[in-house]
UniProtKB/Swiss-Prot annotation:
Main localization category: nucleus
Domain of life: Eukaryota
InterPro entries: PPI_Ypi1 (IPR011107)
UniProt organism field: Candida albicans (strain SC5314 / ATCC MYA-2876)
Protein name as it appears in the record: Type 1 phosphatases regulator YPI1
Comp. bias intervals (Basic and acidic residues): 27-37
Localization: Nucleus
One Gene Ontology term from the biological process aspect of the record: filamentous growth
Alphabetized PANTHER family for the sequence: E3 UBIQUITIN-PROTEIN LIGASE PPP1R11 (PTHR20835:SF0), E3 UBIQUITIN-PROTEIN LIGASE PPP1R11-RELATED (PTHR20835)
Key words, A-Z: Nucleus
Length: 124
C-alpha cells in the first residue's frame, strides 16, 4: 500500500507499507502401524502340494552334440595360414565313452517338493 502526502512547504513524502504474505505449513497426521491379521477361514495354500503354473525351463544340452558343434565352428573361423593348419592336425578330440553318461536330472523348478507337514483344507 502506498500513500503520498504533501507538506506545507511543498515537499512530497511517500510512505510504502508491504505486508508479508502468510506461509502455510502442512503436516500429515501420524499414521498407525499397519498390521496384517488372518481370519480363521483363510486356507493355507503354501503346503498343499499344488502344482505351479509358471515353471522355468532350463536347457539341458545333449552330451556329445554340443561338443561337436563347438569344435566344428572354431575350425571354420581359422585363417588359411600354415601355422594354424599344423595346429589343427595335431589337436584331436578324443571320442567320448558311453560309460560316463549320466541321466540328466530335472532342475529345482521341475521337481515338486515333498512337505512333511501338510495343512488340511477345512471341510475335507
Amino acid at each position: 500500500m502506498s500513500q503520498q502526502r504533501e507538506n506545507q512547504r511543498g515537499i512530497v513524502s511517500q510512505t510504502t507499507t508491504t505486508t508479508a504474505s502468510p506461509i502455510l505449513k502442512l503436516r500429515a497426521q501420524e499414521r498407525q502401524a499397519r498390521d496384517v491379521s488372518w481370519d480363521a477361514n483363510v486356507v493355507d495354500n503354501e503346503h498343499l502340494n499344488k502344482k505351479k503354473t509358471k515353471i522355468c525351463c532350463i536347457f539341458h544340452p545333449s552330451d556329445r552334440n554340443c561338443d561337436e558343434e563347438d569344435s566344428s565352428s572354431s575350425s571354420d573361423s581359422s585363417s588359411d595360414s600354415s601355422d594354424n593348419e599344423e595346429d589343427d592336425k595335431n589337436t584331436k578330440i578324443a571320442p567320448k565313452s558311453n560309460n560316463n553318461k549320466k541321466k540328466s536330472k530335472p532342475n529345482a523348478y521341475e521337481v515338486q517338493p515333498h512337505y512333511k507337514n501338510q495343512s488340511k483344507v477345512p471341510g475335507k
